[in-house]
Amino acid sequence: MTALTPVRSAGTATPQIAPSIRAVGTEDKREICAITRATVQAAIEVLAGTRPIHQLARRLDERCLTALQHRAALIRHESARSPRKLGGLHRNPAVRSVRACEVTPDIYEASAVVIDELRTRAVAVRLERSKQVWRVTALEIG
């Protein structure tokens, strides 16, 4: 007795993913991109001295908030000391693009490109969900 298995071409097998799972992942990714865009914009404005650091206290964890505050203080100190205006380096920043990647269902890593009048910067962000709230646990501004 011979058993024959039907042969399928390589392009016909498509993995079936439940629509509810796909929708949740897509919705999380949209939310992560929106949070990243707003957080990066605010962080660049903090460095420029046009936004107070406390506005990011709910979004950033303590370590990120302290590091950003320290960097902003260094920039302010250096611009006060320098004869040329360093504050002009951060004028009119705009977040041009945001990309996000799921590490686990509760952890995402994202990158953003920020352009201002004189330079383009890359920003990397790690977001972790705790008690249904996304918080930035790592923020690297290039």
How does the language model describe each region?
Residues 54-91:
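Short solvent-exposed beta->alpha transition segments
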Residues 109-115:
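Short beta-strand segments that buttress and anchor functional surface loops
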Residues 38, 47-51, 61, 65:
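Hydrophobic ligand-binding cavity/cleft-lining segments
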Residues 97-100, 111, 123-127:
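Hydrophobic/aromatic beta-strand elements that line small-molecule binding cavities or substrate pockets
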Residues 120-142:
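Short beta-strand edge/turn micro-motifs at domain boundaries
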Residues 1-47, 76-77, 81-95, 100-103, ...:
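Juxtamembrane and targeting peptides
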